[in-house]
Amino acid sequence: VGQNGPQAGTPAHMRALNQRLVLDRLRTHGEATRPRIAADTGLSKPTVGQALLDLEQHGLVRATGRSLAGPGRAAVVYQAAPDAGHVVGVDIGRRVIRVAVADLEGSIVARLDEPNRCRSASALVRTVSDAVDRAVASAGLAPHEVVATVVGTPGVPDPATGTVHRAPNLPGWERRGVLHELVSALAVAGSDVVVENDANLCAVGEHALGAALGVDVLVCLTVGTGIGMGLLVAGRLFRGAHGAAGEIADLPYGPMPSGAGARRPGPMETAAAGQAVVDAARALGLTARSAKDVFRLARAGDERAVRVVEEEAEKLAYVVSAVTAVLDPRLIVLGGGIGGNADLLAGPMRRALAATIPAVPDIVAGQLGEDAVLAGAIATALDTARDLVFDRRGLPHTAGA
């Protein structure tokens, strides 16, 4: 029950608790009859009946119009109303901005991919806001029907200063106050807006829907234009004291640079991200325009490309060994444009790790591909939205409230 709910211990508070218990049962396990809900929750049938009546009046549950076969009187089947609210997920990538709109069951009702050609932070804010508006409209929704929005971005969002730190691949995105501008642009109709690191959302997405289902201690290592890491401990996202957990671009590797630009983009990112793979291939005489070209050549058996891939795997093993020494994860999920080549990387990574750490975690490819961050954004937004639609039940909507 929300902070503005009824006082604890009062009849109104008990009714709210019963309503939430019934609603959570329907969301978690699917549609059911009143007797089934009573058996599952331990509440009496009259209590369940009153809770269902209250929730139905608020638009949070509905009768499906179907009955279960069986002896005696047919029972009405109830379900949580998936359209009681909607959420938006956004993935801001260097080349593509992805937007999805989902109902409270997580079903995608609209999807939009927009090329990112922005050369300034202000242009990027406008482009993201416009893409969200178009996606919401294409779903046939009014802006106020969006309850929560979660945006994934490279770097470390700092809500206190409105700054995104460590995002050198997005022009102007580290400008002070840009986070406030983005949130303001997306919250015009009262939607709760959160901006989260993209690698963190990748981990959440794979945990919710992908390769890490049921795994409570895991690392999602994303490698592409940049390099990042999302950490889940006890099934929950671990951000660290300052929100910078997993910023492995800064991990020391090789000779440490000095001077004003020493931290841009970071020694590990310089050594292992996409451009490093291309540079290593060209140094061996290969013609490669992208890391994708290098992995394609390696699959075709080119010995020089195979050598580059094995060197990349050793660098990634170095990253994994560092985090494994502290976190001891059960699973490493590889994501991003380079990480998606786990079929070539996982073997040499395991061999390198076996020589340095006592327990080598499983290493697998992410299952969600380029949609992993978007899936994590939707999953995170749903957690917020489901609470908000319950806390706001019976209240008239006011834009900006």
Regions found by a protein language model. Name each.
Residues V1-R66, G70-E145, L209, P255-A401:
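ATP-binding/phosphotransfer module of carbohydrate and carboxylate kinases, centering on a glycine-rich
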Residues V87-D91, V146-V150, L218-T222, G228-G230:
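Short glycine-aspartate micro-motif
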Residues D103, P159, L232:
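Short, acidic, Ser/Thr-enriched surface-loop or helix-capping motifs
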Residues R111-D113, R119-L124, L170-A199, V204-R304:
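Glycine/GP-enriched mid-protein hinge/lid loop-to-helix segment characteristic of carbohydrate kinases
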Residues A137, L141-R175, L331, G335-G336:
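Short beta-strand-loop/turn "lid" adjacent to the catalytic site in phosphate-handling enzymes
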Residues V147-A148, D192-N197, D362:
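Proline-centered loop/turn at the N-terminus of a beta-strand
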Residues V156-P159, N200-A203, G228-M229, F238, ...:
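Short, active-site-adjacent cap segments at secondary-structure transitions
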